[in-house]
Protein backbone atom coordinates (compact mmCIF):
# COMPACT_ATOMS: atom_id res chain seq x y z
CA UNK A 1 0.00 0.00 0.00
CA UNK A 2 2.76 2.55 0.80
CA UNK A 3 4.35 1.84 -2.59
CA UNK A 4 1.07 2.41 -4.39
CA UNK A 5 0.60 5.68 -2.48
CA UNK A 6 4.13 6.72 -3.41
CA UNK A 7 3.52 6.03 -7.08
CA UNK A 8 0.31 8.03 -6.94
CA UNK A 9 2.11 10.93 -5.30
CA UNK A 10 4.83 10.79 -7.97
CA UNK A 11 2.29 10.92 -10.79
CA UNK A 12 0.52 13.83 -9.12
CA UNK A 13 3.84 15.60 -8.62
CA UNK A 14 4.79 15.24 -12.27
CA UNK A 15 1.36 16.56 -13.22
CA UNK A 16 1.94 19.59 -10.95
CA UNK A 17 5.28 20.32 -12.64
CA UNK A 18 3.73 20.17 -16.08
CA UNK A 19 0.72 22.27 -15.10
CA UNK A 20 2.65 24.85 -13.08
CA UNK A 21 5.18 25.90 -15.69
CA UNK A 22 2.92 27.00 -18.57
CA UNK A 23 1.00 30.21 -18.79
CA UNK A 24 -2.69 29.35 -18.43
CA UNK A 25 -4.65 29.37 -21.64
CA UNK A 26 -7.84 28.09 -23.19
CA UNK A 27 -8.77 24.47 -23.08
CA UNK A 28 -8.57 22.46 -26.21
CA UNK A 29 -5.30 23.94 -27.45
CA UNK A 30 -1.97 22.23 -27.69
CA UNK A 31 0.67 22.46 -25.01
CA UNK A 32 3.04 24.57 -27.07
CA UNK A 33 0.75 27.61 -27.41
CA UNK A 34 -0.08 27.42 -23.70
CA UNK A 35 3.55 27.61 -22.68
CA UNK A 36 5.70 29.82 -24.91
CA UNK A 37 8.59 29.46 -22.52
CA UNK A 38 8.48 25.67 -22.88
CA UNK A 39 7.89 25.78 -26.63
CA UNK A 40 10.64 28.30 -27.34
CA UNK A 41 13.12 26.43 -25.19
CA UNK A 42 12.67 23.26 -27.25
CA UNK A 43 13.10 24.97 -30.61
CA UNK A 44 16.55 24.93 -32.27
CA UNK A 45 18.29 28.30 -31.87
CA UNK A 46 21.11 28.00 -34.39
CA UNK A 47 19.33 26.83 -37.55
CA UNK A 48 18.40 29.14 -40.45
CA UNK A 49 14.68 28.70 -39.70
CA UNK A 50 14.93 29.11 -35.93
CA UNK A 51 13.78 32.75 -35.81
CA UNK A 52 10.61 32.23 -37.90
CA UNK A 53 9.70 29.16 -35.84
CA UNK A 54 10.08 31.09 -32.60
CA UNK A 55 7.95 33.95 -33.93
CA UNK A 56 5.24 31.49 -35.02
CA UNK A 57 5.21 29.99 -31.52
CA UNK A 58 4.73 33.47 -30.06
CA UNK A 59 1.91 34.24 -32.51
CA UNK A 60 0.05 31.07 -31.55
CA UNK A 61 0.47 31.86 -27.89
CA UNK A 62 -0.93 35.41 -28.22
CA UNK A 63 -3.95 34.24 -30.23
CA UNK A 64 -4.54 31.50 -27.69
CA UNK A 65 -4.47 33.93 -24.76
CA UNK A 66 -6.89 36.28 -26.57
CA UNK A 67 -9.17 33.32 -27.35
CA UNK A 68 -8.83 33.92 -31.10
CA UNK A 69 -8.59 31.16 -33.70
CA UNK A 70 -6.88 33.52 -36.14
CA UNK A 71 -5.77 37.12 -36.32
CA UNK A 72 -8.64 39.58 -36.96
CA UNK A 73 -9.10 40.69 -40.55
CA UNK A 74 -8.80 44.48 -40.45
CA UNK A 75 -9.83 45.43 -43.99
CA UNK A 76 -10.99 48.96 -43.22
CA UNK A 77 -8.96 50.32 -40.32
CA UNK A 78 -10.44 53.11 -38.24
CA UNK A 79 -8.91 56.51 -39.07
CA UNK A 80 -6.12 57.27 -36.64
CA UNK A 81 -7.66 60.59 -35.57
CA UNK A 82 -10.90 58.82 -34.59
CA UNK A 83 -8.96 56.08 -32.82
CA UNK A 84 -6.88 58.49 -30.76
CA UNK A 85 -9.95 60.53 -29.84
CA UNK A 86 -11.79 57.40 -28.66
CA UNK A 87 -8.81 56.31 -26.57
CA UNK A 88 -8.65 59.71 -24.90
CA UNK A 89 -12.38 59.73 -24.19
CA UNK A 90 -12.43 56.20 -22.77
CA UNK A 91 -9.27 56.69 -20.68
CA UNK A 92 -7.92 53.29 -21.77
CA UNK A 93 -4.55 54.68 -22.78
CA UNK A 94 -2.63 57.75 -23.78
CA UNK A 95 -0.92 58.95 -26.92
CA UNK A 96 2.83 59.38 -26.67
CA UNK A 97 4.86 62.16 -28.26
CA UNK A 98 5.78 59.81 -31.10
CA UNK A 99 2.11 59.23 -31.89
CA UNK A 100 2.06 55.66 -30.56
CA UNK A 101 -0.60 54.54 -28.10
CA UNK A 102 0.52 53.65 -24.59
CA UNK A 103 -1.78 51.55 -22.40
CA UNK A 104 -2.47 52.65 -18.85
CA UNK A 105 -0.92 49.65 -17.10
CA UNK A 106 -3.44 49.38 -14.26
CA UNK A 107 -3.06 45.63 -14.05
CA UNK A 108 0.71 45.89 -13.72
CA UNK A 109 0.40 48.48 -10.96
CA UNK A 110 -2.15 46.34 -9.15
CA UNK A 111 0.18 43.35 -9.33
CA UNK A 112 3.02 45.44 -7.89
CA UNK A 113 0.77 46.73 -5.10
CA UNK A 114 -0.41 43.21 -4.27
CA UNK A 115 3.18 42.00 -4.12
CA UNK A 116 4.07 44.94 -1.87
CA UNK A 117 1.12 44.23 0.43
CA UNK A 118 2.20 40.61 0.74
CA UNK A 119 5.57 41.82 2.02
CA UNK A 120 4.03 44.17 4.62
CA UNK A 121 3.63 43.07 8.23
CA UNK A 122 1.03 44.49 10.60
CA UNK A 123 1.95 44.50 14.28
CA UNK A 124 -0.20 45.55 17.24
CA UNK A 125 1.73 46.41 20.42
CA UNK A 126 -0.22 46.98 23.65
CA UNK A 127 0.98 49.72 25.98
CA UNK A 128 2.61 49.31 29.37
CA UNK A 129 2.92 52.12 31.88
CA UNK A 130 6.01 54.28 31.48
CA UNK A 131 8.56 55.35 34.08
CA UNK A 132 6.74 58.64 34.75
CA UNK A 133 3.12 59.62 35.37
CA UNK A 134 0.81 59.80 32.37
CA UNK A 135 3.31 58.01 30.15
CA UNK A 136 2.96 54.87 28.06
CA UNK A 137 5.68 52.50 26.93
CA UNK A 138 5.45 50.59 23.65
CA UNK A 139 7.96 47.82 23.00
CA UNK A 140 7.98 46.89 19.32
CA UNK A 141 8.36 43.15 18.81
CA UNK A 142 11.42 41.54 17.25
CA UNK A 143 9.32 41.03 14.13
CA UNK A 144 8.80 44.78 13.94
CA UNK A 145 12.41 45.71 14.70
CA UNK A 146 13.51 43.63 11.70
CA UNK A 147 11.43 45.89 9.46
CA UNK A 148 12.79 49.21 8.28
CA UNK A 149 10.18 50.97 6.12
CA UNK A 150 7.11 52.25 7.98
CA UNK A 151 3.95 52.30 5.89
CA UNK A 152 1.71 53.45 8.75
CA UNK A 153 1.92 53.80 12.53
CA UNK A 154 -0.87 54.92 14.86
CA UNK A 155 -1.45 55.16 18.60
CA UNK A 156 -5.02 54.31 19.60
CA UNK A 157 -6.42 55.86 22.82
CA UNK A 158 -9.88 55.49 24.32
CA UNK A 159 -11.55 58.59 25.76
CA UNK A 160 -14.28 57.79 28.27
CA UNK A 161 -16.95 60.44 28.76
CA UNK A 162 -19.67 60.37 31.47
CA UNK A 163 -23.21 60.34 30.11
CA UNK A 164 -24.09 63.57 31.92
CA UNK A 165 -21.19 65.55 30.43
CA UNK A 166 -22.27 68.68 28.56
CA UNK A 167 -19.84 71.28 29.97
CA UNK A 168 -17.31 71.09 27.14
CA UNK A 169 -17.81 69.67 23.66
CA UNK A 170 -14.16 69.60 22.55
CA UNK A 171 -10.88 68.71 24.24
CA UNK A 172 -7.31 68.70 22.93
CA UNK A 173 -5.18 65.59 23.35
CA UNK A 174 -1.43 65.77 22.79
CA UNK A 175 1.15 63.01 22.55
CA UNK A 176 4.77 63.77 23.45
CA UNK A 177 7.65 61.41 22.77
CA UNK A 178 10.01 61.01 25.72
CA UNK A 179 13.62 61.21 24.54
CA UNK A 180 16.57 60.27 26.72
CA UNK A 181 19.90 62.06 26.25
CA UNK A 182 23.43 61.45 27.58
CA UNK A 183 24.01 62.70 31.13
CA UNK A 184 24.76 66.43 31.24
CA UNK A 185 23.83 67.07 27.60
CA UNK A 186 20.45 68.66 28.35
CA UNK A 187 18.96 71.01 30.95
CA UNK A 188 15.64 69.37 31.84
CA UNK A 189 14.61 72.02 34.40
CA UNK A 190 12.03 72.01 37.19
CA UNK A 191 9.12 71.17 34.90
CA UNK A 192 10.68 67.84 33.98
CA UNK A 193 11.16 67.03 37.67
CA UNK A 194 7.50 67.86 38.35
CA UNK A 195 6.45 65.50 35.57
CA UNK A 196 8.49 62.74 37.17
CA UNK A 197 11.05 62.61 34.37
CA UNK A 198 14.30 61.27 35.76
CA UNK A 199 17.66 61.93 34.15
CA UNK A 200 18.36 63.90 31.00
CA UNK A 201 15.16 63.84 28.96
CA UNK A 202 13.36 66.03 26.47
CA UNK A 203 9.98 65.91 24.79
CA UNK A 204 8.95 66.00 21.16
CA UNK A 205 5.36 66.65 20.13
CA UNK A 206 4.24 63.58 18.18
CA UNK A 207 0.60 64.27 17.50
CA UNK A 208 -2.13 66.70 18.50
CA UNK A 209 -5.84 66.30 17.99
CA UNK A 210 -9.02 68.15 18.98
CA UNK A 211 -11.67 65.51 19.71
CA UNK A 212 -15.34 65.35 20.58
CA UNK A 213 -15.82 65.14 24.37
CA UNK A 214 -19.51 64.27 24.20
CA UNK A 215 -19.15 60.54 23.58
CA UNK A 216 -16.87 57.70 24.58
CA UNK A 217 -14.88 56.41 21.63
CA UNK A 218 -11.44 55.52 20.25
CA UNK A 219 -9.18 58.23 18.85
CA UNK A 220 -6.30 57.63 16.45
CA UNK A 221 -3.02 59.55 16.51
CA UNK A 222 -0.59 59.13 13.57
CA UNK A 223 3.04 58.60 14.64
CA UNK A 224 4.59 57.20 11.46
CA UNK A 225 7.50 59.65 11.24
CA UNK A 226 8.48 59.04 14.87
CA UNK A 227 8.46 55.26 14.48
CA UNK A 228 10.46 55.59 11.27
CA UNK A 229 13.10 57.61 13.14
CA UNK A 230 13.24 54.97 15.88
CA UNK A 231 13.78 52.17 13.38
CA UNK A 232 16.39 54.23 11.52
CA UNK A 233 18.26 54.61 14.84
CA UNK A 234 18.07 50.88 15.53
CA UNK A 235 15.68 51.34 18.47
CA UNK A 236 12.57 49.31 19.20
CA UNK A 237 10.75 51.16 22.01
CA UNK A 238 8.61 54.28 22.21
CA UNK A 239 7.79 56.25 25.38
CA UNK A 240 4.86 58.64 25.12
CA UNK A 241 3.41 61.18 27.57
CA UNK A 242 -0.31 61.84 27.16
CA UNK A 243 -1.62 65.34 27.90
CA UNK A 244 -5.26 66.49 28.03
CA UNK A 245 -5.57 69.75 29.97
CA UNK A 246 -9.33 70.15 29.42
CA UNK A 247 -10.27 66.58 30.29
CA UNK A 248 -10.76 67.33 34.00
CA UNK A 249 -13.11 70.22 33.25
CA UNK A 250 -15.23 68.09 30.95
CA UNK A 251 -15.19 65.04 33.20
CA UNK A 252 -13.66 62.98 30.41
CA UNK A 253 -10.82 60.55 31.09
CA UNK A 254 -8.26 58.79 28.95
CA UNK A 255 -8.06 55.07 29.64
CA UNK A 256 -4.43 54.28 30.48
CA UNK A 257 -3.01 51.37 32.43
CA UNK A 258 -0.60 50.51 35.22
CA UNK A 259 2.07 47.85 35.48
CA UNK A 260 -0.31 45.12 36.60
CA UNK A 261 -3.74 46.52 35.95
CA UNK A 262 -5.38 49.22 33.92
CA UNK A 263 -6.62 52.41 35.54
CA UNK A 264 -8.46 55.55 34.55
CA UNK A 265 -6.80 58.92 35.01
CA UNK A 266 -8.07 62.42 34.57
CA UNK A 267 -6.25 65.22 32.79
CA UNK A 268 -3.84 65.68 35.73
CA UNK A 269 -2.96 62.02 35.94
CA UNK A 270 -4.91 61.48 39.17
CA UNK A 271 -6.74 58.24 39.74
CA UNK A 272 -10.51 58.69 39.60
CA UNK A 273 -12.77 57.47 42.41
CA UNK A 274 -14.50 54.17 41.84
CA UNK A 275 -12.36 53.25 38.86
CA UNK A 276 -10.58 50.39 40.60
CA UNK A 277 -13.53 48.04 40.84
CA UNK A 278 -12.75 44.58 39.55
CA UNK A 279 -15.90 44.43 37.42
CA UNK A 280 -15.20 47.83 35.90
CA UNK A 281 -11.58 46.92 35.15
CA UNK A 282 -12.67 43.72 33.49
CA UNK A 283 -15.20 45.63 31.41
CA UNK A 284 -12.64 48.23 30.36
CA UNK A 285 -9.93 45.72 29.47
CA UNK A 286 -10.81 46.09 25.80
CA UNK A 287 -9.91 49.79 25.99
CA UNK A 288 -6.22 49.22 26.57
CA UNK A 289 -4.08 51.64 24.48
CA UNK A 290 -2.12 50.12 21.62
CA UNK A 291 0.24 50.96 18.78
CA UNK A 292 -0.66 49.73 15.30
CA UNK A 293 2.33 49.40 12.98
CA UNK A 294 2.41 48.48 9.29
CA UNK A 295 5.96 48.09 8.01
CA UNK A 296 8.11 46.14 5.60
CA UNK A 297 11.76 45.45 4.97
CA UNK A 298 13.61 47.78 2.64
CA UNK A 299 14.52 46.68 -0.87
CA UNK A 300 18.20 46.31 0.08
CA UNK A 301 17.58 44.44 3.35
CA UNK A 302 19.81 41.33 3.32
CA UNK A 303 17.05 39.07 4.68
CA UNK A 304 14.52 40.40 2.22
CA UNK A 305 16.55 39.69 -0.85
CA UNK A 306 15.20 36.50 -2.26
CA UNK A 307 17.23 34.66 -4.82
CA UNK A 308 16.28 36.00 -8.23
CA UNK A 309 16.50 34.02 -11.42
CA UNK A 310 19.56 34.41 -13.60
CA UNK A 311 19.55 36.33 -16.87
CA UNK A 312 21.03 34.39 -19.78
CA UNK A 313 24.16 36.20 -20.97
CA UNK A 314 25.83 33.48 -23.02
CA UNK A 315 28.31 32.77 -20.23
CA UNK A 316 26.20 30.45 -18.07
CA UNK A 317 24.62 27.14 -18.90
CA UNK A 318 22.46 26.73 -15.80
CA UNK A 319 18.77 27.64 -15.70
CA UNK A 320 18.24 31.28 -16.71
CA UNK A 321 15.78 33.66 -18.36
CA UNK A 322 16.33 34.35 -22.04
CA UNK A 323 15.12 37.73 -23.28
CA UNK A 324 13.16 37.60 -26.53
CA UNK A 325 11.19 40.59 -27.84
CA UNK A 326 8.82 40.38 -30.78
CA UNK A 327 7.84 43.68 -32.43
CA UNK A 328 4.26 43.64 -33.74
CA UNK A 329 5.31 45.97 -36.55
CA UNK A 330 8.03 43.56 -37.67
CA UNK A 331 5.63 40.63 -37.86
CA UNK A 332 2.87 42.64 -39.56
CA UNK A 333 0.48 42.66 -36.61
CA UNK A 334 0.49 46.37 -35.86
CA UNK A 335 -2.59 46.82 -38.06
CA UNK A 336 -4.82 45.09 -35.50
CA UNK A 337 -2.83 45.35 -32.26
CA UNK A 338 -2.97 48.99 -31.17
CA UNK A 339 -0.83 48.63 -28.06
CA UNK A 340 1.68 47.67 -26.84
CA UNK A 341 4.25 47.85 -29.62
CA UNK A 342 5.50 44.33 -28.99
CA UNK A 343 5.65 41.33 -26.68
CA UNK A 344 8.44 40.26 -24.35
CA UNK A 345 8.31 36.54 -25.11
CA UNK A 346 10.96 35.61 -22.55
CA UNK A 347 11.61 31.93 -21.98
CA UNK A 348 13.59 29.64 -19.69
CA UNK A 349 16.49 27.47 -20.71
CA UNK A 350 19.52 25.84 -19.16
CA UNK A 351 20.53 22.95 -16.96
CA UNK A 352 19.31 22.20 -13.45
CA UNK A 353 22.08 20.58 -11.38
CA UNK A 354 20.93 18.86 -8.23
CA UNK A 355 22.43 21.53 -5.95
CA UNK A 356 20.17 24.29 -7.30
CA UNK A 357 16.94 22.31 -7.69
CA UNK A 358 14.14 23.69 -5.56
CA UNK A 359 15.91 26.96 -4.82
CA UNK A 360 14.35 29.60 -2.59
CA UNK A 361 11.91 31.93 -4.28
CA UNK A 362 10.46 29.30 -6.59
CA UNK A 363 6.74 28.64 -6.36
CA UNK A 364 7.63 24.97 -6.64
CA UNK A 365 10.45 25.05 -4.08
CA UNK A 366 8.75 23.01 -1.32
CA UNK A 367 7.64 20.28 -3.70
CA UNK A 368 11.02 20.30 -5.44
CA UNK A 369 13.00 20.13 -2.20
CA UNK A 370 11.08 17.06 -1.04
CA UNK A 371 11.53 15.29 -4.38
CA UNK A 372 15.19 16.30 -4.62
CA UNK A 373 15.83 15.01 -1.09
CA UNK A 374 14.78 11.50 -2.10
CA UNK A 375 16.25 11.69 -5.60
CA UNK A 376 19.77 12.54 -4.39
CA UNK A 377 19.65 9.60 -1.99
CA UNK A 378 18.80 7.20 -4.79
CA UNK A 379 15.38 6.32 -3.44
CA UNK A 380 13.29 4.70 -6.16
CA UNK A 381 11.17 5.81 -7.97
CA UNK A 382 12.56 9.36 -7.51
CA UNK A 383 16.12 8.42 -8.49
CA UNK A 384 15.54 8.89 -12.23
CA UNK A 385 13.65 12.17 -11.97
CA UNK A 386 15.34 15.24 -13.44
CA UNK A 387 14.74 18.87 -12.52
CA UNK A 388 13.29 21.18 -15.16
CA UNK A 389 14.04 24.83 -15.90
CA UNK A 390 10.63 26.49 -15.66
CA UNK A 391 9.09 29.95 -15.08
CA UNK A 392 8.85 30.76 -11.36
CA UNK A 393 7.48 34.30 -11.64
CA UNK A 394 5.24 35.73 -14.32
CA UNK A 395 3.62 39.14 -14.72
CA UNK A 396 0.46 40.28 -16.50
CA UNK A 397 0.16 42.21 -19.74
CA UNK A 398 -2.53 44.56 -21.09
CA UNK A 399 -3.41 44.61 -24.79
CA UNK A 400 -5.47 47.00 -26.91
CA UNK A 401 -6.60 45.60 -30.26
CA UNK A 402 -9.29 45.45 -32.95
CA UNK A 403 -11.60 42.48 -33.30
CA UNK A 404 -13.19 41.36 -36.59
CA UNK A 405 -15.97 43.91 -36.15
CA UNK A 406 -13.56 46.86 -35.88
CA UNK A 407 -14.36 47.15 -32.17
CA UNK A 408 -11.57 48.27 -29.86
CA UNK A 409 -10.92 45.71 -27.14
CA UNK A 410 -8.75 46.12 -24.05
CA UNK A 411 -7.84 42.87 -22.33
CA UNK A 412 -5.75 42.26 -19.22
CA UNK A 413 -3.98 38.91 -19.48
CA UNK A 414 -2.57 37.29 -16.36
CA UNK A 415 0.75 35.39 -16.29
CA UNK A 416 1.74 36.54 -19.77
CA UNK A 417 5.40 37.50 -19.41
CA UNK A 418 8.11 35.38 -17.81
CA UNK A 419 9.96 37.42 -15.18
CA UNK A 420 12.11 34.76 -13.48
CA UNK A 421 13.14 31.17 -14.06
CA UNK A 422 14.16 28.43 -11.67
CA UNK A 423 14.55 24.70 -11.30
CA UNK A 424 11.50 22.69 -10.38
From Swiss-Prot:
Residues 264-306 are annotated as: Disordered. GO terms for molecular function: cytokine activity; growth factor activity; hormone activity; identical protein binding; peptide hormone binding; protein-containing complex binding; signaling receptor binding; type II activin receptor binding. Residues 21-308 form a propeptide. Disruption phenotype: Activin A-deficient mice are born but die only within 24 h of birth because of craniofacial defects. One of its GO terms (biological process) is striatal medium spiny neuron differentiation. It is found in: Secreted. Uterus, ovary and liver. Disulfide bonds join 312-320, 319-389, 348-421, 352-423. SMART domains: TGFB. Residues 1-20 form the signal peptide. It holds the Pfam family TGFb_propeptide. This is Inhibin beta A chain. The lineage of its organism: Eukaryota, Metazoa, Chordata, Craniata, Vertebrata.
Amino acid sequence: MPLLWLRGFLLASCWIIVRSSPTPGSEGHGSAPDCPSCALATLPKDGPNSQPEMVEAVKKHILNMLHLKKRPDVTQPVPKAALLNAIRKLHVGKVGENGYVEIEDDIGRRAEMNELMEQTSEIITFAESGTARKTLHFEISKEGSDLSVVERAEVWLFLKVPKANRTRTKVTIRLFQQQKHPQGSLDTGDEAEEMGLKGERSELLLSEKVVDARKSTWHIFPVSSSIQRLLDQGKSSLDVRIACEQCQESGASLVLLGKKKKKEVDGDGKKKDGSDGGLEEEKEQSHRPFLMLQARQSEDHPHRRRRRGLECDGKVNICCKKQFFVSFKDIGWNDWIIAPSGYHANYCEGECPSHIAGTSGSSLSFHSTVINHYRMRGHSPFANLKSCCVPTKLRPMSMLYYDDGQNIIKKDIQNMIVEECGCS
